[in-house]
């Protein structure tokens, strides 16, 4: 399974680079957890979690969600603490792959995957004039 995950991270790196992202690092680890891919999308620093499943196991693997938010944010904070260039927006993406054989896969890229994990606070509105 580790080999499958490594192949999925390589495929994700290639996918992101073909879409104009600059991949800074793969497989970054700290005590809080791992960040599969760190990249930039224009001025935004993007932390990407990669999940993979063999086609024989069924459809796309589930990406992370609200339950993983704390772990991912803690790992991102540790990453930012170790690196100089931190004055930029940050985003969390998910990439899920279903692999068919040695060289084929379906890939799903969920941009800003943790945006749904932010609780809706009643009465929280934008100031007038802000859209």
Describe the role of every protein-language-model region.
Residues 83-131:
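Domain-level recognition of nuclease-like catalytic cores that cleave nucleotide substrates
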Residues 18-45:
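Active-site metal-binding core of divalent-cation-utilizing nuclease and nuclease-like domains
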Residues 53-78, 82:
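Mg2+/Mn2+-dependent nuclease catalytic core
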Residues 3, 7, 32, 59, ...:
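Residues at secondary-structure transition points
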Residues 37-58, 72:
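Conserved catalytic cores of phosphodiester-cleaving nucleases, focusing on short active-site segments
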Residues 1-27, 103:
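Acidic-basic catalytic patches of nuclease active cores, encompassing PD-(D/E)XK
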Residues 28, 50-52, 112:
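Active-site donor-binding loop signature of nucleotide-sugar glycosyltransferases
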Residues 20-21, 46, 108-113:
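Secondary-structure boundary/capping motif
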């Amino acid at each position: 399974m580790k080999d499958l995950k490594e192949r999925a991270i390589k495929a994700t790196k290639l996918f992101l680079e073909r879409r104009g992202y600059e991949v800074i690092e793969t497989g970054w680890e700290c005590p809080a957890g791992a960040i599969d891919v760190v990249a930039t999308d224009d001025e935004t620093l993007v932390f990407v979690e990669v999940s993979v499943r063999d086609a024989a196991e069924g459809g796309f693997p589930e990406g992370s969600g609200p339950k993983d938010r704390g772990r991912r944010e803690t790992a991102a904070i540790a990453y930012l603490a170790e690196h100089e260039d931190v004055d930029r927006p940050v985003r969390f993406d998910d990439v899920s792959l279903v692999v068919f054989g040695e060289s084929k896969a379906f890939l799903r890229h969920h941009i800003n995957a943790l945006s749904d994990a932010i609780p809706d606070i009643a009465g929280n509105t934008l100031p007038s004039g802000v859209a």
